Amino acid sequence: NIERKLEIKMHFPVGVLVDKKGKKLEELLAPYQENTMGNCPKEFLEFMEATEEINEYEDHKEDYETLDEFMEDYYGIEKDKETGKYGYWENPNAQWDWYQIGGRWSNMLLSKNGYKSNYLQLKDIDWNGMYEISKKQAIETWDSNENGIYRMLNGIKKDDTKESYIERMSKFETYAVITPDGKWHSKDKMGLFSVSTNEDDNRNKSFYDIFIKDADQELILVIVDCHI
Protein backbone atom coordinates (compact mmCIF):
# COMPACT_ATOMS: atom_id res chain seq x y z
CA ASN A 1 0.00 0.00 0.00
CA ILE A 2 0.94 3.69 -0.05
CA GLU A 3 2.37 3.72 3.49
CA ARG A 4 4.52 0.68 2.74
CA LYS A 5 6.06 2.41 -0.27
CA LEU A 6 7.03 5.42 1.83
CA GLU A 7 8.97 3.42 4.38
CA ILE A 8 12.72 4.02 4.57
CA LYS A 9 14.64 1.32 2.73
CA MET A 10 17.53 -0.31 4.53
CA HIS A 11 20.01 -3.19 4.55
CA PHE A 12 20.43 -5.37 7.62
CA PRO A 13 22.20 -8.64 8.52
CA VAL A 14 20.18 -11.75 9.30
CA GLY A 15 21.61 -14.88 10.87
CA VAL A 16 19.92 -17.97 9.43
CA LEU A 17 20.42 -21.24 11.30
CA VAL A 18 20.23 -24.08 8.80
CA ASP A 19 19.84 -27.76 9.65
CA LYS A 20 21.28 -29.92 6.86
CA LYS A 21 18.45 -32.39 7.49
CA GLY A 22 15.76 -29.68 7.44
CA LYS A 23 14.69 -26.70 5.37
CA LYS A 24 17.18 -25.12 3.00
CA LEU A 25 18.22 -21.47 3.25
CA GLU A 26 15.82 -20.42 0.48
CA GLU A 27 12.93 -22.22 2.18
CA LEU A 28 13.62 -20.51 5.50
CA LEU A 29 13.71 -17.06 3.89
CA ALA A 30 10.73 -17.51 1.54
CA PRO A 31 7.91 -16.89 4.07
CA TYR A 32 9.27 -13.38 4.71
CA GLN A 33 9.60 -12.11 1.13
CA GLU A 34 7.88 -8.86 0.22
CA ASN A 35 5.79 -9.00 -2.96
CA THR A 36 7.31 -5.90 -4.58
CA MET A 37 8.38 -7.79 -7.72
CA GLY A 38 5.25 -9.93 -7.90
CA ASN A 39 7.26 -13.13 -7.47
CA CYS A 40 6.58 -13.94 -3.82
CA PRO A 41 5.18 -17.50 -3.48
CA LYS A 42 1.37 -17.30 -3.50
CA GLU A 43 1.05 -19.40 -0.36
CA PHE A 44 2.43 -16.51 1.71
CA LEU A 45 0.20 -13.79 0.24
CA GLU A 46 -3.06 -12.23 1.37
CA PHE A 47 -5.29 -9.94 -0.67
CA MET A 48 -5.49 -6.44 0.78
CA GLU A 49 -8.44 -4.47 -0.57
CA ALA A 50 -7.69 -0.83 -1.49
CA THR A 51 -10.39 0.51 0.82
CA GLU A 52 -8.92 3.97 1.36
CA GLU A 53 -8.36 4.54 -2.34
CA ILE A 54 -11.91 3.40 -3.14
CA ASN A 55 -13.39 5.72 -0.51
CA GLU A 56 -11.43 8.63 -1.95
CA TYR A 57 -13.47 8.34 -5.15
CA GLU A 58 -16.25 10.27 -3.39
CA ASP A 59 -14.07 13.40 -3.59
CA HIS A 60 -13.34 12.97 -7.30
CA LYS A 61 -16.70 12.10 -8.83
CA GLU A 62 -16.77 15.38 -10.76
CA ASP A 63 -13.59 14.39 -12.58
CA TYR A 64 -14.25 10.66 -13.07
CA GLU A 65 -17.55 9.16 -14.20
CA THR A 66 -16.90 5.70 -12.80
CA LEU A 67 -14.95 4.09 -9.99
CA ASP A 68 -13.13 1.95 -12.55
CA GLU A 69 -11.94 5.04 -14.41
CA PHE A 70 -10.81 6.70 -11.17
CA MET A 71 -8.91 3.69 -9.84
CA GLU A 72 -7.16 2.93 -13.12
CA ASP A 73 -6.33 6.52 -14.10
CA TYR A 74 -5.71 8.16 -10.71
CA TYR A 75 -4.05 5.24 -8.89
CA GLY A 76 -3.08 2.93 -11.72
CA ILE A 77 -4.92 0.06 -10.05
CA GLU A 78 -6.90 -2.50 -12.04
CA LYS A 79 -9.34 -5.01 -10.64
CA ASP A 80 -7.69 -8.18 -9.45
CA LYS A 81 -8.70 -11.00 -11.79
CA GLU A 82 -8.91 -13.58 -9.02
CA THR A 83 -11.00 -11.61 -6.52
CA GLY A 84 -12.73 -9.12 -8.80
CA LYS A 85 -11.77 -6.38 -6.34
CA TYR A 86 -9.34 -3.49 -6.24
CA GLY A 87 -6.34 -4.13 -4.08
CA TYR A 88 -2.92 -5.72 -3.67
CA TRP A 89 -1.52 -9.14 -2.94
CA GLU A 90 0.84 -8.67 -0.01
CA ASN A 91 2.76 -10.82 2.43
CA PRO A 92 1.67 -9.73 5.94
CA ASN A 93 4.88 -11.22 7.34
CA ALA A 94 7.22 -9.54 4.84
CA GLN A 95 10.68 -8.67 6.14
CA TRP A 96 12.80 -8.41 2.96
CA ASP A 97 12.52 -7.69 -0.77
CA TRP A 98 16.09 -8.70 -1.74
CA TYR A 99 18.87 -10.72 -0.15
CA GLN A 100 22.41 -11.90 -0.73
CA ILE A 101 24.60 -14.26 1.26
CA GLY A 102 27.28 -12.15 2.92
CA GLY A 103 26.82 -8.92 0.98
CA ARG A 104 27.65 -5.90 3.12
CA TRP A 105 28.51 -8.31 5.94
CA SER A 106 30.81 -10.61 3.95
CA ASN A 107 33.17 -12.79 5.98
CA MET A 108 31.53 -11.83 9.26
CA LEU A 109 32.30 -15.24 10.77
CA LEU A 110 35.74 -16.44 11.91
CA SER A 111 36.55 -20.14 11.96
CA LYS A 112 38.69 -21.87 14.55
CA ASN A 113 41.14 -22.51 11.71
CA GLY A 114 41.59 -18.78 11.24
CA TYR A 115 39.71 -18.14 7.99
CA LYS A 116 36.66 -15.92 7.54
CA SER A 117 33.42 -17.01 5.93
CA ASN A 118 29.76 -16.15 5.31
CA TYR A 119 28.65 -19.49 6.75
CA LEU A 120 30.05 -22.01 9.21
CA GLN A 121 28.84 -24.83 11.40
CA LEU A 122 28.39 -23.57 14.95
CA LYS A 123 31.03 -25.98 16.22
CA ASP A 124 33.62 -24.40 13.91
CA ILE A 125 33.06 -20.73 14.82
CA ASP A 126 35.71 -18.98 16.91
CA TRP A 127 33.43 -16.87 19.11
CA ASN A 128 36.25 -15.72 21.40
CA GLY A 129 38.38 -14.75 18.43
CA MET A 130 35.57 -12.68 16.93
CA TYR A 131 35.01 -10.99 20.29
CA GLU A 132 38.66 -9.99 20.58
CA ILE A 133 38.75 -8.63 17.02
CA SER A 134 35.58 -6.59 17.57
CA LYS A 135 36.86 -5.32 20.91
CA LYS A 136 40.13 -4.15 19.35
CA GLN A 137 38.24 -2.38 16.56
CA ALA A 138 35.91 -0.71 19.08
CA ILE A 139 38.84 0.60 21.13
CA GLU A 140 40.53 1.99 18.02
CA THR A 141 37.29 3.59 16.83
CA TRP A 142 36.63 5.26 20.19
CA ASP A 143 40.19 6.55 20.53
CA SER A 144 40.23 8.00 17.01
CA ASN A 145 36.81 9.70 17.21
CA GLU A 146 36.88 12.01 20.20
CA ASN A 147 34.49 14.57 18.75
CA GLY A 148 32.30 15.33 15.76
CA ILE A 149 29.85 13.58 13.48
CA TYR A 150 32.07 10.52 13.02
CA ARG A 151 31.14 9.43 16.55
CA MET A 152 27.53 9.04 15.46
CA LEU A 153 28.48 7.37 12.18
CA ASN A 154 30.51 4.81 14.12
CA GLY A 155 27.65 3.97 16.46
CA ILE A 156 28.82 6.03 19.43
CA LYS A 157 25.78 7.19 21.39
CA LYS A 158 25.48 10.51 23.19
CA ASP A 159 25.53 8.95 26.66
CA ASP A 160 28.17 6.32 25.86
CA THR A 161 31.28 5.88 27.95
CA LYS A 162 34.29 4.17 26.45
CA GLU A 163 33.46 1.06 28.46
CA SER A 164 29.79 0.91 27.42
CA TYR A 165 30.65 1.45 23.76
CA ILE A 166 33.33 -1.24 23.74
CA GLU A 167 31.06 -3.70 25.53
CA ARG A 168 28.21 -3.15 23.05
CA MET A 169 30.34 -3.24 19.91
CA SER A 170 32.30 -6.32 20.99
CA LYS A 171 29.23 -8.54 21.13
CA PHE A 172 28.40 -10.56 18.04
CA GLU A 173 24.82 -10.32 16.87
CA THR A 174 22.69 -9.83 13.77
CA TYR A 175 19.63 -7.63 13.30
CA ALA A 176 17.40 -10.71 13.14
CA VAL A 177 17.62 -14.50 13.31
CA ILE A 178 15.73 -17.27 11.54
CA THR A 179 15.79 -20.52 13.48
CA PRO A 180 15.56 -23.99 11.85
CA ASP A 181 11.84 -24.15 12.66
CA GLY A 182 11.33 -21.21 10.30
CA LYS A 183 10.57 -18.56 12.92
CA TRP A 184 11.82 -15.00 12.45
CA HIS A 185 13.25 -13.41 15.60
CA SER A 186 14.02 -9.70 15.79
CA LYS A 187 14.52 -7.28 18.65
CA ASP A 188 11.57 -5.52 20.24
CA LYS A 189 11.44 -1.94 21.53
CA MET A 190 13.28 -3.06 24.65
CA GLY A 191 16.17 -4.34 22.55
CA LEU A 192 15.32 -7.97 23.37
CA PHE A 193 14.98 -10.84 20.91
CA SER A 194 11.40 -12.12 20.80
CA VAL A 195 12.03 -15.77 21.59
CA SER A 196 10.27 -15.91 24.95
CA THR A 197 6.92 -14.80 26.34
CA ASN A 198 8.75 -13.58 29.43
CA GLU A 199 10.95 -10.61 28.53
CA ASP A 200 12.91 -11.05 31.77
CA ASP A 201 14.24 -14.35 30.39
CA ASN A 202 16.29 -12.51 27.78
CA ARG A 203 17.00 -9.19 29.48
CA ASN A 204 20.64 -9.96 30.28
CA LYS A 205 21.27 -12.62 27.65
CA SER A 206 23.47 -12.16 24.60
CA PHE A 207 22.91 -13.34 21.04
CA TYR A 208 25.21 -16.27 21.84
CA ASP A 209 23.27 -17.23 24.99
CA ILE A 210 19.90 -17.14 23.23
CA PHE A 211 20.63 -18.74 19.87
CA ILE A 212 23.99 -20.53 20.01
CA LYS A 213 24.91 -21.84 23.45
CA ASP A 214 22.29 -24.61 23.70
CA ALA A 215 21.74 -25.14 19.96
CA ASP A 216 22.78 -28.20 17.97
CA GLN A 217 26.39 -27.39 17.12
CA GLU A 218 26.01 -29.16 13.77
CA LEU A 219 23.74 -26.33 12.59
CA ILE A 220 25.11 -23.96 9.96
CA LEU A 221 24.96 -20.23 10.65
CA VAL A 222 24.57 -18.30 7.39
CA ILE A 223 24.96 -14.51 7.33
CA VAL A 224 22.51 -12.94 4.90
CA ASP A 225 22.39 -9.31 3.75
CA CYS A 226 18.69 -8.44 3.52
CA HIS A 227 17.07 -5.31 2.11
CA ILE A 228 13.62 -3.88 2.76
Where are these regions (language model features)?
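Acidic (Asp/Glu-rich) sequence patches and key acidic residues
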Residues: 4-206, 214, 228
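C-terminal or internal capping secondary-structure element at the end of a domain, subdomain, or sheet
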Residues: 218-228
